[in-house]
Swiss-Prot record:
Its EC number is 1.18.6.1. The key enzymatic reactions in nitrogen fixation are catalyzed by the nitrogenase complex, which has 2 components: the iron protein and the molybdenum-iron protein. The gene is nifH1. CDD domains: NifH. This is Nitrogenase iron protein 1.
Length: 275
């Protein structure tokens, strides 16, 4: 049975980098068949898996060529180790609703049978915070069953993660979606591991994995590759291998208990991350 996963996190946290490296690790080390559906109007959720190729998005195809042109051949590309990739895209800057584009794109993929039964995982890589109904769609309508939140020990990253949990709490009963855990993409801030463990525990979930910071991630990106493709024997690639294994074996799925703003600020203050 295909597992449908949504990756959420604050913009700039490294969510798409983490998601793509995890997908690459699942395929390369664990032999899994992966489909990545990018749900970010920047359309950068699949770039590393595709070797830097700028993918034609579903919304661009709809705008320029019409719905009949949205075919698997036109919008789905295959990247590293057979990973299939599609990008929702978004409206022209300043016009329309990007969240609406996510809804349209997912519906079109379902109608054309793109989420085939032979897939082991579908990754929905979703823009930052749950800022509107469109970006909440993967969790609101049960498109994804599991959510992993990419965060760090910085205040705004934990604030965004907490907001995402509020969205999860709102939709969990109707859609069946559950939180699988927090993935810390380390920024090397003081007491980061300890704070993220406490934050995850307060939410009623687990710190699924702590991804250390390593410059090879940037080197791989300069070469338009995931770390797993760039150097599959390096330490960081093996970290992603272990993260993928944690997701594969995860059996802790919860409805989160979001913190109040006061609770969140007090926790951050305790760890000395605020002036």
């Amino acid at each position: 049975m295909t597992r449908k996963i949504a990756f959420y996190g604050k913009g700039g946290i490294g969510k798409s980098t983490t998601q793509q490296n995890t997908a690459a690790a699942m395929a390369y080390y664990h032999g899994k068949k992966i489909f990545i559906h990018g749900c970010d109007p920047k359309a950068d959720c699949t770039r590393l898996v595709l070797g830097g190729v700028a993918q034609t998005t579903i919304m661009d195809t709809l705008r320029e060529l019409g719905e009949d042109a949205v075919t698997a051949e036109n919008v789905i590309n295959t990247g590293f180790d057979g990973i299939k990739c599609v990008e929702s895209g978004g409206p022209e800057p300043g016009v329309g609703c990007a969240g609406r584009g996510v809804i349209t794109a997912i519906n079109l993929m379902e109608e054309m049978g793109a989420y085939s039964e032979d897939l082991d995982f579908i990754h929905f890589d979703v823009l930052g915070d749950v800022v509107c109904g469109g970006f909440a769609m993967p969790i609101r309508e049960g498109k994804a069953q599991e959510v992993y939140i990419v965060a760090s020990g910085e205040m705004m990253a934990t604030y965004a993660a907490n907001n995402i949990c509020k969205g999860l709490l709102k939709y969990a009963e109707q859609s069946g979606v559950r939180l699988g855990g927090i993935i810390c993409n380390s920024r090397r801030v003081d007491n980061e591991l300890e704070m993220m463990e406490e934050f995850a525990s307060a939410l009623g979930t687990q710190l699924l994995y702590f991804v250390p910071r390593d410059n090879i991630v940037q080197k791989a990106e300069f070469n338009k590759k995931t770390v797993v493709e760039y150097d599959p024997t390096c330490n960081q690639a093996l970290e992603y291998k272990e993260l993928a294994k944690k997701i594969l074996e995860n059996d802790m799925f919860v409805i989160p208990k979001p913190l109040s703003m006061d609770q969140l600020e007090k926790m951050v203050e305790r760890y000395g991350l605020m002036d």
